[in-house]
């Protein structure tokens, strides 16, 4: 499927999605948003893709919603219409976090602000460099957090630190971002995408059904009590048996002291 506002590259079971509006620091317009939703659905159905990397073209990851677009400006009359108009902003978080049943990595080149920061937080992991910067920005627009930030940020950095970042709307530079957990890996800027790809290939090596179920189990664990989560873990183990070759291969390679070859079957 051709895209106008993003690039899609697939190699070695790893997909790289590059937001391509560099003149706008990859701000999310309605058209880009629709393509993000479409590429999520495409990658979900592609069994040859095991890990997805999100990044941005040019000098920024994503500066948030493009407020110059008519949809973002809000041409509506009633409160219900206003809610409908703003509702589209967060749907990419649902697609990436909930519906894209594959590990996701954000490679943060430059700034991730507002809904762009939320996009990064919706990914399972984040790789950055000394140029990476985060900014919640909503309070500066006389807005409360949206696009999933109020869900993701406290879970990643803790409640009080999340309040700090939202209330002050200050920039979080790369070193602090790494220290507080906004970034999981910090690499030289020239190696950013390679670093993300190295991480993706490490993940893609493992049995895909087990990886997919691990994502679901871990997500569920952030919202469940212990008893419910133990039941869901058991469900995950049973589900993983749907790939009998990989189950047998894991045991055989361990016995034979050789690297495993997982197929997803």
Model-derived features: positions:
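Conserved CoA-thioester-binding segment of acyl-CoA-metabolizing enzymes
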Residues: 1-57
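Terminal peptide-recognition signature
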Residues: 17, 21, 36, 54, ...
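Crotonase-fold acyl-CoA enzyme core
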Residues: 30, 95-211, 244, 248, ...
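Hydrophobic alpha-helical membrane-association signature
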Residues: 32-35, 89, 192, 233
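Glycine- (often His-adjacent) and acidic-residue-rich active-site loop
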Residues: 56-96, 112, 142, 225
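Localized chelating/binding microdomains
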Residues: 82-87, 140, 144, 173, ...
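Helix-loop "lid/cap" segments that line or gate small-molecule binding pockets
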Residues: 165-166, 177, 217, 221, ...
């Amino acid at each position: 499927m051709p895209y106008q506002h993003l690039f899609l590259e697939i190699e070695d079971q790893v997909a790289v999605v590059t937001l391509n509006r560099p003149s706008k620091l990859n701000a999310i317009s309605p058209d880009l948003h629709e393509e993000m939703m479409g590429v999520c659905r495409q990658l979900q159905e592609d069994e040859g893709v095991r890990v997805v990397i999100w990044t941005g073209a040019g000098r920024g990851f994503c500066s948030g919603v493009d407020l110059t677009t008519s949809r973002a400006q809000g041409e509506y009359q009633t409160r219900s219409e206003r809610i409908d108009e703003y509702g589209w902003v967060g749907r990419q978080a649902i697609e990436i976090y909930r519906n894209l049943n594959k590990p996701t990595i954000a490679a943060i080149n430059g700034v991730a602000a507002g809904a762009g920061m939320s996009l990064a937080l919706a990914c399972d992991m984040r790789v950055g460099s000394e140029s990476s910067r985060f900014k919640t920005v909503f309070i500066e627009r006389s807005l409360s957090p949206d696009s999933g930030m109020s869900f993701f940020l406290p879970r990643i950095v803790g409640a009080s630190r999340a309040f700090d970042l939202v209330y002050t709307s200050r920039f979080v530079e790369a070193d602090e971002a790494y220290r507080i957990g906004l970034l999981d890996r910090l690499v030289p800027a020239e190696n950013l995408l390679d670093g993300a790809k190295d991480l993706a290939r490490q993940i893609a090596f493992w049995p895909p059904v087990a990886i997919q179920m691990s994502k679901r189990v871990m997500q569920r664990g952030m919202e469940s009590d212990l008893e419910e989560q133990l039941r869901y873990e058991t469900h995950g183990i049973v589900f993983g048996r749907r790939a009998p070759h990989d189950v047998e291969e894991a045991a055989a390679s361990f016995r034979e002291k050789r690297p495993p070859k997982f197929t997803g079957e």
